[in-house]
Amino acid sequence: MFMCFKISINKSLAILITLLLTIPVSIFYCQDYSKIVRLSGKISNPNSDKIFIRGKDFKKVIKVSSEGEFRDTLKVEPGDYSFYDTKESTSIYLEPGYDLHITIDTKEFDETIKYVGIGERPNNFLASYFMFKEKNAIGNNEYKKMSAQEYFDHSIINYEKSLTLLNQSKIDNESFAYKQNETFTFQLLSELIGSKVGKEYFSGKSTAIITQYLDKKINSINFKDELLFQSSYSIRFFNSYFTAGLVANDINCLNKYENDINEQQKKGIITSLKRGISFYNEEEMDAYYLTLKKLLGDDNSFQKIKTKYEQINSLKKGNPSPTFNYPDSSGKSVSLASLLGKLVYVDVWATWCGPCKAQIPYLKELEEKYRTKEVAFVSISIDQLKDSTKWKKMIVDKELKGIQIMADNAWQSTFVKDYIIEGIPRFILIDQSGNILSPNAPRPASYNEGNYALNDEIQKLLDENL
C-alpha cells in the first residue's frame, strides 16, 4: 500500500534548498567552447524549417525558426562540410573553436552568403571562390570548340587566379590555407586528366608544354602516401589518373597501380573502370572492357561485366529496339508497335526525379517545334504503381504533352531492364521501323555557360532521320 507522509523541514534548511535551486546551472557546468563549433544565422526567404550540416561520418539537423533564425553547437573534426537547406547548398569549413554567424538570402543564395565571427575568413574566401568558379566555368559547347592546348591554358589561368584569390584573402589559418592550396592542385589535375588534355597526354600526342607540366606535377605526388588521398578532390584525381592511364595502357601508370597502391584503392579504381561500361562512354567502352579483362582475368566479377558489355552491344544503332506496351493515364495501352511509321523519342523519367523535371519545359518546347512532323514523343514514368495518382496529377498540373504512359514495375520493368537504364532521365530515339537510332539520345536541354537551352544535338538528330 502506497502512503503519503508529512515531513517536517526546519525553516533554515528550506531557505537553503530554495537558494540552491535558483542558482544558474552554468556555475556548476562550464562548456569548453574550444572543443565545439557554435553556429548561428539568419536566412531570408527560408526554403525549409531545417538545415543540414554534413561531413564525413557526420550529420546534424538544425531547426530554423519561422523568422529564419537558427542556432546550435556542433562537435566536429576540422574539415570541409556541406551546408544544405533542402534546395541550395554550399561548402563550409569548420573546426573546434569556431563561432560563426551566417546570413543568406535564398533568392540569391551564393551571391548573398556572408560569415561573421571566429572562422569568418576561410568561409568568406570559400564563398567568393565558388562565385569565381561559377563565373569562369565554360559550357559544353565552348569546351567542344577548344583544342587541348586551349583548354589547358584556360585551366592554368583559372588555377593561378584561384591561388591569387587565396593569398589576397589573408587567411589566418595556415592549415586551411595549405589544404586549400593542395585542393586547387588536385582539382586542376582532375580537370586536365579527365579531359581531352589527358587523352592526348596518355596517347603521347600532347604538346611539350603540357607533357612537361603534367609529368612534373604527377611525379611529385607520392602515390604510396595513403593519407594524401583522403579528400574528395584527391580521390577524384586518383581515380581519374588511374582510369585514364590504365585504359591508355600507360606503362608508368600501370607500374604505379601494381606497386604503389593498396588493394582497397585498387578496388576503387576497378569500380571507376566499371562505370566506363556504359552508353555514356560509347567511344571508349571497348578499351575499358579490355582493360578490365586484363586486370581481373576470368573471375566472377568480370563475368558480370562481360554480360553487361554484351547486352550494351546488342543495343547498337540499327538493331531492333526492345518494345513496350504500357497504359496511359486513361488506361489505354500504348505499344511501340502502334507507333511504327514515326520517329519515337522516349523519355524515361519519374515524378520524384529533379533532373527529369528540369527537362520538361524544353521537352514541351521540342514537342511544339515538331508538332507537325512524324515524331511521337513518349514519356514513360517509372514511378511505383502505388504512386500512379501522383503521376496523373503531375500530368495535369504540369500540362504534360505527348504520350504519357506508366511502366508496370518501376526499375524492374522489362523495357527499363532491356535498355540497362540505371539512371534517369534517359532518352532513347527509335526509327520508323522500330529499330534503334540512339540508345542514349541527347536530352531536350543542354547546359551551357550557366544556363539551360534547347539542345541543338537532338534537333539535328531528329531532322536527319525524318
PLM feature segments, named:
Residues K179-V197, E226-S240, N262-G276:
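Amphipathic alpha-helical repeat scaffolds of TPR domains
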Residues Q303-L336, K401-I403, D456-E464:
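N-terminal "domain-start" segment that seeds a small globular fold
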Residues M1-I36, L461-L466:
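Bacterial Sec-dependent N-terminal signal peptides
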Residues L429-L466:
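Thiol-/selenol-based redox modules, centered on thioredoxin-like
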Residues D32-K179, Q187-G204:
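A non-transmembrane, solvent-exposed segment enriched in polar/low-complexity residues
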